[in-house]
Each structure stands twice: as C-alpha cells, then as structure tokens.
C-alpha cells in the first residue's frame, strides 16, 4: 500500500525515476476509471506528484518530524489524512492543526478505536 518502494531494499534495482513513473501510472489508471487516488507516505516525491494525486495519506509524520513535507497537498487545496500510533494527541494535534492535516491517533491493531484531533 506504500508508494515509496524505491526507499527500501528490494533485491532489484528500483530507482526514484521508476517510482515516479509507477506512481503516475497508478494515478492515471485511477483517474481513467473515475476514481480519486491518494499518495501514501512517499514524502520525498510529493513536489513531483502533488499534481497527479487527489489527496495524501500518511502514517507517523509527527513521530518522525516529517509533517511539513505534506504541505504541498494543503497548498494545492487537497486533503491530507494522517494517523499516529505512539505519539500522544497533545503532542501531534497542535502540529496537525497548524498544518491543516486531518489527523487521528489509532491503536496498531487498527480496530474501531480512534481519537481524532
């Protein structure tokens, strides 16, 4: 479900350029079918991909101090859906509200419990 495979050890050569092409293909295929499509966690390529995707999904940007990287989506008037698992709401919600992220805390078991900002 992540669109940043090039940042991981894959066992075969996968470059940032390959990832850009793949991500754009996914966005094009979704749009051809009348679907909205979200970019999940590929923070490094957001500047190149914000025009191709309709929204962003992020896990743990507050924990890793990366939430500001999602700002191009907000500036383009596109939603950012964000979840934290270990960081308390009192820590990440002020950041999320300042950046205008739609944020919540979830448990890792991903049951029904949630605590939105």
What are the residue ranges of the model-derived segments?
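Glycan-processing catalytic domains of CAZymes
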Residues: 1-117
């Amino acid at each position: 479900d992540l669109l940043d495979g090039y940042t991981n050890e894959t066992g075969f050569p996968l470059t940032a350029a390959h990832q850009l092409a793949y991500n754009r293909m996914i966005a094009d295929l979704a749009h051809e079918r009348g679907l909205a499509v979200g970019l999940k966690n590929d923070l490094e390529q957001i500047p190149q991909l914000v025009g191709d995707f309709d929204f962003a999904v992020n896990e743990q940007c507050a924990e890793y101090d990366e939430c500001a990287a999602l700002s191009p989506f907000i500036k383009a008037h596109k939603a950012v859906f964000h979840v934290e698992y270990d960081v308390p709401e009192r820590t990440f919600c002020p950041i999320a509200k300042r950046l205008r992220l739609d944020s919540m805390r979830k448990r890792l078991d991903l049951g029904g419990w949630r605590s939105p900002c």
